[in-house]
Design a protein with these regions (language model features):
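Cysteine/selenocysteine-centered motifs that mediate thiol-based redox chemistry or coordinate metal-sulfur cofactors
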Residues: 257-277
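Active-site phosphate-binding and catalytic loops of NTP-dependent enzymes
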Residues: 27-33, 254-261
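Alpha-helical recognition segments enriched in aromatics with Gly/Pro capping
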Residues: 1-86
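Short solvent-exposed loop/turn micro-motifs enriched in small/polar/acidic residues
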Residues: 38-40, 60, 215-217, 256-258
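A short, contiguous, amphipathic alpha-helix enriched in charged residues
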Residues: 234, 238-257
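Residue-level structural signal for beta-strand termini and adjacent loop
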Residues: 59, 235-237, 277
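Helix-rich, typically C-terminal accessory recognition domains appended to large enzymatic cores
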Residues: 17, 34, 66-235, 265-270
Length: 277
């Protein structure tokens, strides 16, 4: 059987009907040993313009030529993925192209500005890198391509902010980011692959795997309350016991602590509530 069939719902009374009929007939006469022609079926939606399916007869077709000329084919490709869930119809809007175009330029600039810095790996950057691998991989596997693109934007912003804070990005993170974006912006991916000093095609590279250890939380945020009202938030080591967390919370409150403490409540990993008079 075919691993994946991608087609619009309009094929249900044509290709799919014929394919299933022939497959079941061949199975019945013992020629094949499977009864369905496709392991997985994905019906994509249609791109619409002015509320109607794009059609030459309706005169609402958008030619990609000018868009490719002005923004590049990677921007057009990524915007098509970003416009909405692939299984639903989506309304085309040329203005949305600008945001994707700006993102690709920011991404390119980020890699180029950091490729020669030889900055060492940090735990914080390693965590962001692995979070990005996890999100992009999971969303790609489930065909959630619109959230893949939004995920690139969100994670790139986080990595950019951290790079400014710590002074650079390590080479492995740059390599990983380039590999991740390549299926969605192949021309930029290939160019950046060469610019960071890699040989051959980026599409011969191995897809990165998540390091689960890098994703483990080392700190937790605790909400500190007095008589049920939020007064502060603290970040503490995840290994701290109840008494240590309460002690840290009381230290944070300082002179705001009640004179007479009646009770100290700790909800593990979430809240410290000091009850007093």
């Amino acid at each position: 059987p075919v691993d994946m069939y991608v087609g619009g719902v309009e094929h249900a009374v044509l290709h799919l009907l014929y394919a299933r009929f022939y497959t079941k007939f061949l199975y019945d006469i013992g020629v094949i040993d499977f009864v369905e022609p496709f392991k997985k079926l994905f019906n994509q939606g249609m791109i619409c313009k002015d509320g109607a399916k794009m059609s030459k007869s309706k005169g609402n077709v958008v030619s990609p030529d000018e868009l490719v000329r002005d923004y590049g084919c990677d921007s057009v490709r990524m915007y098509e993925l970003f416009v909405g869930p692939p299984e639903l119809d989506a309304e085309w809007n040329d203005r949305g192209m600008e945001g994707v175009y700006k993102f690709i330029n920011r991404f390119y600039k980020l890699i180029m500005e950091n490729k020669d810095k030889n900055y060492g790996k940090t735990a914080e950057m390693d965590k962001l890198k692995n979070k990005m691998i996890q999100e992009i991989t999971e969303r790609t596997d489930t065909f959630s391509f619109n959230t893949v693109i939004s995920g690139f934007m969100e994670n790139t912003n986080k990595i950019t902010d951290l790079a400014k804070k710590q002074g650079g990005i390590d080479k492995d993170t740059l390599k990983t980011m380039t590999i991740l974006i390549a299926p969605f912006a192949p021309h930029i991916g290939e160019e950046l692959w060469a610019m960071i000093g890699k040989e051959g095609s980026i599409f011969e590279a191995t897809w990165p795997e998540v390091d689960e250890n890098a994703l483990k939380e080392t700190t937790m945020e605790i909400v500190v309350q007095i008589n049920g009202k939020v007064k502060a938030k603290i970040n503490v080591d995840v290994t701290l016991d109840k008494d240590s967390v309460i002690s840290a919370a009381k230290e944070e409150l300082g002179d705001r602590l009640p004179e007479n403490i009646v009770k100290e409540i700790y909800v593990p990993g979430k809240i410290v509530n000091i009850v007093g008079k």
